[in-house]
A protein has these predicted regions:
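Residue-identity detector for threonine
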Residues: 2-5, 42, 53, 69, ...
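Glycine-centered flexibility motif
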Residues: 2, 7, 93, 129, ...
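Broad structural signal for hydrophobic residues in well-ordered alpha-helices, predominantly aliphatic
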Residues: 26, 67-68, 124, 157
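Short, extreme N-terminal segment that most often corresponds to the first beta-strand
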Residues: 1-28, 36-38
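Long, compositionally biased intrinsically disordered terminal regions
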Residues: 105-161
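Short, intrinsically disordered low-complexity segments
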Residues: 30-105
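Exposed alpha-helical structural elements
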Residues: 21, 59-63, 138, 153
Length: 161
């Protein structure tokens, strides 16, 4: 077991429902995680750096980010710092709803990821159940610039939501 260590990245997945309701799904995963009840959500984060798979597919944070959310726990919102980039994932409600991705890199801004379905900022606002007055434009503004750190961008996103 390799406990999650500082500097290995950061990650949090927010799924609908209680931690107890998500327990079975979480036990079947390839990474060891902890779950905590939050108002309206369950927060899921890593407790070990490595997944139960062989390299190069053993990076726990990437496995957690890419893990599909069961339809009963959707919508889900993932917030990660991976390889120096801020990564936001959303899996909306719906039987075959695909996971969407937004990747922001310092000095470059939002990056195109040809192999990953893009995540419109309006979808982030809609999934999170934002407060009245928060617009998709406000969410887009978080990722408009190219300066700052990935963690700063994610914290700013949470403050907007």
């Amino acid at each position: 077991m390799t406990l999650a260590t500082p500097g290995a990245g950061h990650g949090l997945v927010l799924v609908r429902g209680s931690a107890k309701a998500s327990a079975r799904w979480l036990r079947r995963g390839l990474v060891a995680v902890a779950a905590v009840d939050l108002p309206g959500w369950t927060g899921v984060c890593l407790v070990e750096d490595r997944a139960r798979t062989k390299p190069p597919y053993d990076r726990g944070l990437e496995v957690l980010a890419a893990r599909p959310t069961p339809w009963g726990r959707r919508p889900s919102l993932g917030l990660f710092v991976v390889d120096g980039c801020a990564v936001v994932t959303v899996q909306p409600r719906g039987w075959r709803a695909e996971q969407r991705w937004l990747v922001w890199q310092p000095g470059q801004g939002v990056r195109r990821t040809p192999d990953l379905p893009p995540l419109p900022t309006g979808m982030i606002a809609g999934i999170a159940g934002v407060s009245p007055g928060v617009t998709p434009a406000a969410v887009a503004e978080v990722f408009r610039g190219t300066s700052g750190t990935p963690l700063d961008r994610l914290v700013q996103l949470l403050s907007v939501l």
